[in-house]
Every structure is written in structure tokens, then in C-alpha cells.
Amino acid sequence: MGLPWYRVHTVVLNDPGRLLSVHIMHTALVSGWAGSMALYELAVFDPSDPVLDPMWRQGMFVIPFMTRLGITNSWGGWSISGGTITNPGIWSYEGVAGAHILFSGLCFLAAIWHWVYWDLEIFCDERTGKPSLDLPKIFGIHLFLSGIACFGFGAFHVTGLYGPGIWVSDPYGLTGKVQSVNPAWGAEGFDPFVPGGIASHHIAAGTLGILAGLFHLSVRPPQRLYKGLRMGNIETVLSSSIAAVFFAAFVVAGTMWYGSATTPIELFGPTRYQWDQGYFQQEIYRRVGAGLAENLSLSEAWSKIPEKLAFYDYIGNNPAKGGLFRAGSMDNGDGIAVGWLGHPIFRDKEGHELFVRRMPTFFETFPVVLVDADGIVRADVPFRRAESKYSVEQVGVTVEFYGGELNGVIYSDPATVKKYARRAQLGEIFELDRATLKSDGVFRSSPRGWFTFGHATFALLFFFGHIWHGARTLFRDVFAGIDPDLDAQVEFGAFQKLGDPTTRRQVV
């Protein structure tokens, strides 16, 4: 046939049996990839430190999605929360991976069967005997079935009525666990950070889908609408399906990048806006202030800060710090976090407490500037020593650590003070192991960044695909050169000019 690569799908355009076959094969590939990827991630995943080396630091992509749906245990005897277990049950990480691979194999066989037995009676129009699909009826069937699945997920799986529930955490990603969720039917259900909205929206959308499916099964479209929207053309199905997919891809790119109840920070890492807004820093200071109000010493108050919370307040966990073409996990960048060194508090010789200005997200380098509580610059690390007025040496800056591994340690030598001032630009200070993975010290993005980039990019491509195929199906007659208002039966090849009887070809 000699088709160019971008036209090869025309071979299934008027062949319902093989059109079904290639879609089943596509499902086999997707499911097989998911199962295989899960097994690969489980082979390289280290569950030993869920606080400082969580799944998102290790670049896990499919494990977070399994976890948010209620899978927490492994046949290897470990739990995602860090404990050990003896009876993980069939629906472990490996069980889900195996189920996907098994389903992939069954789809593979089904695809082969439908490719071989393509000419089935069900695909034929009784009146003409030619291949034909009742597309509005098929639409109704699919809408009805997807409505049942959507309703069932919201009413049973998420609520824990028949299922595990979903991953639910606090606003600071400290207490996350799988639990059942009650539907939120009030205005709070529209808050993207309220888990109850997931249950209520699936129940509502599923109910609507069931009713809409029954409507499309029982009511035929008007003839004018049927013809106007080209409902008899399979390319209309392709165009509208692409629209649904690219719309969903844009939505999930947004919920992933900006954060929501569906993308917990314990599973996907924090968002860039939490660094930009000093979200975790404010909570840490609030907790320290509350500790001081309870007559704790500064050291005791900082020692009560959870290591997990301090780790979120580190720029290396910002997904926007990864660069284009920097492949690999966060651990391959700045290294595996080993421990929190503590919170450094800088003071000059006059006793002013100094704060290091933090690096904004899109800077690779940033001047080291120390300001007091009023925002007045008191010290810095100068670019030109000859012109310096506020250098660490001149101002006599010291640093003392509170909490963490260096709790109570004071440094006064300028070289060490400057070292920790530079590191304080990046948030809380952690000891990082760069030797184990030969980490190069260049920040990487988290799975949150990869997911957003991938889905936003493909959504844009699919948007153009929707326009392309929508235009092809709506204006097919124009592209083919056939006047839709031409009532006379046209015999192709009879005239030199299509439909013009004055140009009848001469029979030789």
C-alpha cells in the first residue's frame, strides 16, 4: 500500500474488528509497562528511611500512585511507613504489579484473537451487510460503564466501605497514612486540599455518567445534530476522545504542580510554591515560638522540630530546581540525606541575631547576605574583599546550632561561619552522602516535576491532535472536493471535471 508513517492508521479506519484489536493491544502495552515499571522500581527502591530518603527523593514514579490508592505493604516484608510486616496480603506492591502484567498478557491474546477474527457479525449493519458501528449507542455504553466505575471508586474504595481508602495527610506532610474518607458534600468539597472532595466528586460524577449513559442508550440524536457533528464518522470519535484526554492531562498537570489532596507531598515531594512562600519555615518558627512560650530553652524548642518537617524546608527538595536534561533522581543530584545538622543562628559581635537571605527558586548562585530582624544588612560574603564593609571577618559573625546533630556547637572562625552561611541560603542544613550514588551535586527535580512536564507537554500535543482530527471530520467533504449540496448522483471518472456533465469523457 506504501503509506507514509503518519497515515498508517487508515488501515483500521473502516475495519471495526481490527480497530478494536489495536486498542486492546495498546491497553496491553500500557498495562505491561505499568507492571514492569513497578517491578523495576521495587527492585531499586530502598524503604529503610522514609523520612530522609522517601520514594520521591529516589525518583520513584509508579510507587507513589499505588500508595495513594491504598497500597502500603510489600512481599519483601517492609511497609512504606518504615516498619516490618509479616502478612502483606495479595494486594501488595508486587501483587498489583503482577496483576497488571497478567492483565497485559490477557489483552495481548485478546488483541491477536480480534486481529485474526476481525469479520464478526456484531460489526455488520443488518440492512447493508457492510461493516458499521452504531457510534451513539457505543458512546452510551461506555459512558454508562465508566459512570459505574467512577461511582464505585468514590462510594466504595475511597470511603473504605469496600476497599482500603486513600492516602490522607496533614497540611505539612507529617502524619500521612491510608485511611477511609467520608464524602464532603458542602462547600469544603470544592477545596482541592480536602480529601472528602475526592469521594463526593466521584460519587456525583459517576451518578451523572450513569444517567447520561442511560440517556444516550435510550434517546437517538436528532438527524440534524447527527449530521452536523458527523456522529457516523469514526474520526469524530477520535477527535472527541483526544479532547477528553488532553483536558484531563491539563487538569492533572495543574493539580500536581500546584498541589492538591490527590498529590500528597509525602508521596510526590513538596511543591515549588512551598519554598517560594516559606511555607515550612513559617510552621517551624511557629512551633519554636510555641515551645519558647512553654518555657523551653531555644535548644529544646528546636530539638522538638521533626526531622521530616525540617527536610521539607530545604531547597534541594524543590521540584523547580531540577534543570532540563538533568536525568535521574534527587538522590543522584545533591546526594542521600543522612541527618539534620540543626538550625544555625548567626550573631554579630554586637549581639544582633542575623538571618541569611534564602536563595530564590530560579537562581543557581546568590550573594550571601545576612540581615537583622529589621531587614538591615549587617554582614555578607563580599565579591571584592578590598571594597568590603560587612564581611564576616569585619563584623565578627559567629554561628550556633540548635537541634539536630550539632546541637549546642558554636563556630567563630570565619571560614566555617561562611561555609554554613552559604548552606543556610538553601534552607535547613543537612548532611548529604554523595559518595554512595556518585551524586554530582547538581539539583534534580522530583517525580512531581517530571509528571507535570510530561502531562503538560502531551496535553499541548494532543490539543493540536484534537484540532487536526476535528477539522478533518467536520470538513471532510471540503477536503475531498465534494459539494455537500450536490443532489445529483455523481459517477466518479465519468467527467473530466467532477459533477460537470459538459466535460464528459469520450469513450475511445
Swiss-Prot record:
Topology of this chain in the membrane: Multi-pass membrane protein
Principal subcellular localisation of the protein: plastid
Subcellular location: Plastid, Chloroplast thylakoid membrane
Ranges annotated as spanning the membrane: 21-36, 101-115, 140-156, 203-218, 237-252, 457-472
GO cellular component assignments: chloroplast thylakoid membrane; photosystem II
Record text on cofactor binding: Binds multiple chlorophylls. PSII binds additional chlorophylls, carotenoids and specific lipids.
GO molecular function ontology, one term from the record: chlorophyll binding
Keywords carried by this UniProt record: Chlorophyll, Chloroplast, Chromophore, Membrane, Photosynthesis, Photosystem II, Plastid, Thylakoid, Transmembrane, Transmembrane helix
Gene Ontology BP annotations: photosynthetic electron transport in photosystem II
InterPro entries, sorted: PS_antenna-like, PS_II_antenna-like_sf, PSII_PsbB
NCBIfam families cross-referenced by the UniProt entry: PS_II_CP47
Role description: One of the components of the core complex of photosystem II (PSII). It binds chlorophyll and helps catalyze the primary light-induced photochemical processes of PSII. PSII is a light-driven water:plastoquinone oxidoreductase, using light energy to abstract electrons from H(2)O, generating O(2) and a proton gradient subsequently used for ATP formation.
Subunit structure: PSII is composed of 1 copy each of membrane proteins PsbA, PsbB, PsbC, PsbD, PsbE, PsbF, PsbH, PsbI, PsbJ, PsbK, PsbL, PsbM, PsbT, PsbX, PsbY, PsbZ, Psb30/Ycf12, at least 3 peripheral proteins of the oxygen-evolving complex and a large number of cofactors. It forms dimeric complexes.
Similarity comment: Belongs to the PsbB/PsbC family. PsbB subfamily.
Protein name: Photosystem II CP47 reaction center protein
Source organism of this protein record: Phalaenopsis aphrodite subsp. formosana
